[in-house]
Design a protein with these regions (language model features):
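Solvent-exposed soluble domains appended to multi-pass membrane proteins
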Residues: 1-222
């Protein structure tokens, strides 16, 4: 039988509720048209709408960030939770302004954004630190642990979201701490990401706030 590259993620899918497009329950959702890049996947999953190319006049689909308003009239999960009094933070290891992700998050939910620039400004990384899109997922999960602990210390409910990037095309980023079990970088990066995600989930499950917490794991795009 074939050896799984991501056994930890497969186990999470099979032992929990999985919205897979496969009968086996292993595999992500089936991507719809105009949801196949980062900010489009974020918008589709939070507001249920695709980002049509005509929104940017036929230009590069990430040009939506140049507009003052991001999807005016759309109503997202972030806005629902904001009205319910949730503290909301989004952690990412790249610049939130890319593709207009910052506008999506601030105009549809009033998120506190902790991105690559935030990490530099607050001394989490040095000013000249740059790997891959900004900083690697190993740091992302550590910063997410710190932020989850901070949010949980408040008496308000919270929505913490994080966006991994090591598995992003074209080449993907293989952290030096990741094992090189397989013969190619693609497999090794995904295998490492599977372990990192599972470790973060297990950490959350060990925390006092886990009892009233829902964890959602989703691929933002292919």
């Amino acid at each position: 039988s074939e050896t799984s590259i991501i056994p930890e993620l497969e186990e999470l899918a099979l032992k929990n509720t999985s919205f897979s497009n496969k009968a086996s329950g292993v595999g992500g959702a089936l991507p719809a048209t105009n949801t196949g890049w980062t900010v489009a996947g974020m918008a589709a999953q939070s507001a249920g709408v695709p980002l049509k190319e005509n929104l940017v006049g036929g230009r590069d689909h990430n040009a939506l960030g140049e507009f003052k308003k991001f999807l005016p009239g759309a109503y997202s999960l972030g806005e629902i939770l904001e009205k319910q009094g949730y503290n909301q933070t989004f952690v990412m290891g790249s610049e939130a302004s890319f593709g207009g992700r910052d506008k999506l998050l601030t105009q549809h939910g009033n998120f506190n954004i902790e991105d690559y620039n935030y990490a530099k400004k607050h001394g989490k990384i040095s000013d000249d630190y740059k790997v891959w899109w900004g900083y690697e997922d190993k740091k992302l999960f550590q910063f997410a642990r710190e932020e989850a602990s901070r949010l949980a210390a408040s008496d308000k409910q919270f929505n913490l979201q994080l966006l991994t990037a090591d598995t992003h095309f074209t080449d993907r980023y293989l952290d030096e701490t990741c094992a090189k079990t397989f013969s190619n970088q693609y497999d090794n990066v995904h295998a490492c990401s599977s372990k990192q995600v599972a470790a973060f989930v297990n950490w959350v499950k060990s925390q006092p706030f886990y009892e009233n917490t829902t964890i959602i794991i989703s691929g933002d795009h292919l």
